[in-house]
Amino acid sequence: MAAMMNNERSSSNKLQVDAENPAAVGDELDLAARANWLRAAVLGANDGLVSTASLMLGVGAVKAEARAMVISGFAGLLAGACSMAIGEFVSVCSQRDVELAQLERDGKRGGEEEKALPSPAQAAAASAMAFSVGAVVPLLAAGFIVNYRLRIAVVVAVASVALAAFGCVGAVLGRAAVARSSARVVLGGWAAMGITFGLMRLFKASGI
């Protein structure tokens, strides 16, 4: 009972402090918004890394030339960045329309709430940039290695290190277990790369 009373007193004091210091509340909300943006950027970079590395390994399973792998990776970077940007733009536009309609009903159009709404163009640019940052990692890893086996190994190794780093950052931002989150991201990336490489090897072996 005493613990409950202490908790209630603590909550009451916190509310009183927040009410007396609205700037602190605004700072907390701003930090939370920034953390969400950063976490979305990490996820976008992870998508770019996994999809591009898997695409390059899939092409590498059929063709041993470095040029073919690099060109396929660059094409994947461009296509993925455009797809992410367009998808994010459409998604944020839809969200913005809904929130503007709500502000219209509340009679708050033109106020601070409207100015605080997310920008579709900024969201699209950020999404494309994040994807590109992740996608360029395997491209740089494979672009300067002539030996086929070494190139494949380096792409997998560099992608694994980057995946672990992305998983670590995502865990810190989401306040989750770092080791478990990083392992989950790395294992997921390995699964995507392994399945793509293996299926393309079977495709090559079938002679189709």
Swiss-Prot record:
<dbReference type="GO" id="GO:0005774">
    <property type="term" value="C:vacuolar membrane"/>
</dbReference>
<keyword id="KW-0926">Vacuole</keyword>
<dbReference type="GO" id="GO:0030026">
    <property type="term" value="P:intracellular manganese ion homeostasis"/>
</dbReference>
<comment type="function">
    <text>Probable vacuolar iron transporter that may be involved in the regulation of iron distribution throughout the plant.</text>
</comment>
<keyword id="KW-0410">Iron transport</keyword>
<feature type="topological domain" description="Cytoplasmic">
    <location>
        <begin position="91"/>
        <end position="125"/>
    </location>
</feature>
<dbReference type="GO" id="GO:0005384">
    <property type="term" value="F:manganese ion transmembrane transporter activity"/>
</dbReference>
<feature type="topological domain" description="Cytoplasmic">
    <location>
        <begin position="1"/>
        <end position="41"/>
    </location>
</feature>
<keyword id="KW-0812">Transmembrane</keyword>
<dbReference type="GO" id="GO:0016020">
    <property type="term" value="C:membrane"/>
</dbReference>
<dbReference type="GO" id="GO:0005381">
    <property type="term" value="F:iron ion transmembrane transporter activity"/>
</dbReference>
<feature type="topological domain" description="Vacuolar">
    <location>
        <begin position="63"/>
        <end position="69"/>
    </location>
</feature>
<protein>
    <recommendedName>
        <fullName>Vacuolar iron transporter homolog 5</fullName>
    </recommendedName>
</protein>
<feature type="transmembrane region" description="Helical">
    <location>
        <begin position="42"/>
        <end position="62"/>
    </location>
</feature>
<keyword id="KW-0472">Membrane</keyword>
<keyword id="KW-1133">Transmembrane helix</keyword>
<keyword id="KW-0408">Iron</keyword>
<feature type="transmembrane region" description="Helical">
    <location>
        <begin position="152"/>
        <end position="172"/>
    </location>
</feature>
<feature type="transmembrane region" description="Helical">
    <location>
        <begin position="70"/>
        <end position="90"/>
    </location>
</feature>
<feature type="transmembrane region" description="Helical">
    <location>
        <begin position="185"/>
        <end position="205"/>
    </location>
</feature>
<keyword id="KW-0406">Ion transport</keyword>
<dbReference type="InterPro" id="IPR008217">
    <property type="entry name" value="Ccc1_fam"/>
</dbReference>
<comment type="similarity">
    <text>Belongs to the CCC1 family.</text>
</comment>
<keyword id="KW-0813">Transport</keyword>
<feature type="topological domain" description="Vacuolar">
    <location>
        <begin position="206"/>
        <end position="208"/>
    </location>
</feature>
<feature type="topological domain" description="Cytoplasmic">
    <location>
        <begin position="173"/>
        <end position="184"/>
    </location>
</feature>
<feature type="topological domain" description="Vacuolar">
    <location>
        <begin position="147"/>
        <end position="151"/>
    </location>
</feature>
<feature type="transmembrane region" description="Helical">
    <location>
        <begin position="126"/>
        <end position="146"/>
    </location>
</feature>
<dbReference type="Pfam" id="PF01988">
    <property type="entry name" value="VIT1"/>
</dbReference>
